[in-house]
Swiss-Prot record:
Species lineage: Eukaryota, Fungi, Dikarya, Ascomycota, Pezizomycotina
One of the Pfam families matching this protein, by short name: NST1
Source organism of this protein record: Neurospora crassa (strain ATCC 24698 / 74-OR23-1A / CBS 708.71 / DSM 1257 / FGSC 987)
Job description of the protein: May act as a negative regulator of salt tolerance.
Keyword Coiled coil found: yes
Name of the gene encoding the protein in the UniProt record: nst1
Sequence segments annotated as region (Disordered): 1-225, 294-388, 423-491, 526-727, 757-876, 944-1001
Gene Ontology cellular component list: cytoplasm
Coiled-coil residues: 517-708
Name recorded for this polypeptide: Stress response protein nst1
Amino acid sequence: MKGNSRHPSVPPPPLAPQSPTSKATAKYTNKDGSKFITVPKGSTPADSAQPSPTITTAANAAPGPQSASTSHTQGHGLGQAEGQVQPVNKKKAKRRQKAAAKAAATQGIANPAPSNGFPSPSPSHAQQSTEADHDDSHDEHLEEFNNRRDSRASNIHENGFAQGATTSSKKSKKKKKKSHAGQNAAELPNSPQHDTYVPAPQLSQHPRPGISKEKIWNTSSQEERERIKEFWLGLSETERKELVRVEKDAVLKKMKEQQKHTCSCTVCGRKRTAIEEELEGLYDAYYEELEQYANHPNQGEAPPMLGRRPSFGSMTGMRPRGLPTSYPSHHQPSHAQIVDHGAEEDDEEEEVEEEYSEDEQDEDDYSDDEPSEELHRSDYPADFFNFGNSLTVQGGILTVADDLLKNDGKKFIEMMEQLAERRMAREEDARDQFGSPFSHSAGDRNAHYHPPADDEVDDEEYDEDYDDDEEEEYDSQDEEETMTEEQRMEEGRRMFQIFAARMFEQRVLTAYREKVARERQNMLLEELADEKRRSEERLVKKQKEAQKKKERQARKKELQAEEKARREEEKMAEEKAKKAEEDRQKEQRRQKEEEKRKQKEAQKKAEEEERRRKEAERQRRNHEREENERKARELKEREKKAREEARLKEKEAREQKEREAKEQKERQERQERQEREKREREAKAKAEMEAAKAAKDKSKQEDRAAQKAAALATTAPVPITLPKRPAQPIQTSVPAAVPALPQQPAAYASPVIPVATPAFPKVPAPAQSRQIHQQESVTTSSGPTSQPGSAVSQNPSPHTLTPILTSPGPVKPPSKSGVAVSGTQNSGVQLPSPAPSTTVNAGSKPLQSQANPFGGPSMNMPFQPTPQPPPGFSNHMQPQYPPFYNPANSYNRVAPGMMAAPPGFSAPLGGRAMSMHSPGFPGPLDSPVSSFAGLPAGLSSLLGKDNVPSHTRQGSGSFEIGPVSSSSQPISRPTPIGRPASVVHGQRRSPEFSTNGTDQAEQEVHLGSSALLEPDDTQQDFPARSHFGLLGTSAPGVRSAPGFGGGPFGMETGFSLPHQNSPWNPVPPLQHNPFVPPPPGFPSSSHHGPWSQAAPPGIMGRNPSIVERSAPWSVTLRKSLCAVCEDLGAGGSSSYDGFIPLGEIMAHMKQFTVNEKEVLDICDTEGNPSNGGGSFIVRDPLSPSGSPLIRYVPDDDASRAPYGPIKHPGDIGSPIVGSGSFHVGS
């Protein structure tokens, strides 16, 4: 066949008899694990079968004399399994399984199998054997069909639904079809063994051992049927109607919905209408008959629809009554037992609800598949409540509606026709064999059936197998007469009624099972509570036992602990002793190491202390050395200051004494001078006439002398040594004034012009020799008065009527020590003319304008044009004026920015006012642009006796040149050579000294060379010279007049010669000219000029010997810082080992607008001779809020030696005075 061709199989051999010692059960579990099935391998006798919703066994009644058939035993076992629910405790389940296996083994020994190996049927199945003997030959095909269906269902349940029921059912079906004929042939000789009959009540005489006596858990099939009947009769009318009512409308509605998309032609519509009408008629007829039977359940005859109950061998595994009873042993269903894991009743309840949740579609599930067989109800035709063996509805089986939709109901009608014919034949045979339909019990109807799921039964294969069977059946029934149309319709109604009846049975069975499930659930809850209580009791008992056991163990442990503690104590004592010994040894080693460490530390500490002591001693020595040095330095400074103060005090005392002496002397001299002047005026009046004549002669001689001097201008000077003459007593009265000879320096030879000497009173010789001596010394004036009898009148008479007589004489050479003429002295004095016999009257009338023999302007008209100079002189004859000279106001004028000297005082060395002098003649030494210095003796005498020096000896190089007194002084006795008071260290001449005559008297006493001055004293004159070079080094008195070249005969003329130092000579091209170019008409010098880098002396008010270069601001600041640090360090202001706080330094540098950072930056500058030298040490402040500390370290003397001051004239190593032009003899 089609279905078997796809799954060929080999028929298995017959099973051997069960051994009593073999394992009696096999265990199966469903998919979800909620249930497991234990199936005994051997058959055991049972009282009866009960309906079960989960297990269905095939009733394969083999012929034999056994007291219980396989089907009967199976039904009993299943009923017992259904009623029994395993508790939660697994131990009880195992005990029950063992008891069931033991009972099965015992039953197998008591009822041994026949020699052919097939079990003998029970006596209650004798009717089945009898029916098998009367089966007709035309039923063989149906028997084969049913056997195949039975084998399929049996094989499904033997293997369990949870273990792949689909595959097992297919294989079993194929095995049945192939091996059925041979098996039947082999079993036919044993068929007479089934003829024995045993009444049904004997089934209850063999209760199953090990089963609980509670009937709710353990009931037989018969008892369950009785219970179902009692349940039905106990229901009310409404409950019965509710159970038996079939939802006709739901079925029709479902059919309409399924046919909605089918063909809508008229033919199909008529078919659908006919089917619907037929179904309605069938349902209505079924309701009427069911109601009649329900109202009369105990009638003798069963209703027409229940005359014969259909047998669903294809699904239940039960063999029809008319079939042979010889089946192979492997079709024999095993005794099965269901064990639920907690809620069997709930699963059954849910299963039943699911079965009826599809709007009564399940009613048709049995109309297509199940009517192929029928179950003979001859043994209980009137027992309606002996319901079909476990009608569990499952999905997936073809329903009536599906059949009607697929093949228009043709298959359904044909199936019902065939079944009707076979049923009728079997019923007739059964009536013929058994007289009464109630003579047999339903012991063989106890098998339960569980329809397979959708995936376990292949509907297509089922239909194919069914079609093949039908073909074979139709082939074997060709000779049978066909039924009429009315019979087919009647048979269809009966088959539908059978289907509806079975559905009714299913509903009643479901309701009953729901009730039983509830009862079992309650009982289970009670058992669970009991089990829980017993468990709690057992738990308490166990706890008590455990407690006792713990106590025993505790006592035992205590003993062991005591023993162990004792051993531990002994062991610890030993270890303690051992450890004490080790500790003692370790302590000894530690003490030794500690002693060594202490010794090392002591040694190290001693070394450290020694090092610290040495370091402290070294620091102390350094500190002491520094302190000693500082103290020595301070002591030296203090001694130096003390010496200076003592020297100053001595000088002040001496000066005070000298001033007092000079004042006394001046008073005396003033009185004497007044008397002398009176006598001189008288003498001058007498000699006025001779003086005029003498002057005329002298003028002629001077002209000749000037020509001769011009011729001798180029001759080299010859050093002349003049002997000194002792001073003579001063004559107090002179009969007549004799013109004084012109004063000449000792280094020049003066031409002597012989002139006629008038008859004048003879001048004493000492006075003449003294005049020669005065040319070699610095003159001083003791007062304005002159002594009578003096040969030289040095000041004009205060009386205006006194004439001044001049005599011709040689031209006066330039004077090295001129007189600074102040404004008060020169007021009212006119320049006299050198003409002979000229009388100057200062009070009555001005002098007459006379021609200047040297081409200069006249004396009373100094600004007239001058004639050409004599031969041999420079051609620069025009007046050469300095840049700041104003010829209109020449007297007592100073350059812009220069300070003029007060009246009666000589201008200081560096800032003398410019005085008018004759062009071509240099000024005096102390006034570089002075007037009247260098005039001829006659003109000099006209200026007054105060302007003529009485002592003209030049100092030997001192920078301090005192002003010349305006009055003639008597020559006193020479004193030993000593240090002049004017050059005392650190002293300057004050203006008051020049007025009261103290300096004059001092210079009279202190004559001689300045070479005896101390070198260190001379170095203090100009402190700046220690760091700056001087621009000029020529000594005063021997230098040329500034701006004017030297004239012939060693004279300093105002006429510029080539290569002479003149401020109006051309400026050298390489020199920087910081000033404006010279004005037009002023010649330039090839050397130094006023617009060169070195300003001319007198122009800027500075002596060329001490003019300094302009220094940068940083150099000035550093020099000031050096001076401040030296002053503070010398004064003991530093209290930090020579370091001075920056705050104190800033307090002494207020004249500079600098901050601390600039001062600190200046401290980092390297010292050199130009910025102060030395170096600075800066230390961090001692406290965060303090200021840095600065210490100035000056350079040593060796480093300063090359930059020392230039020696003064007369010092050892000083430059040669006059650049070797002359030598002054002593």
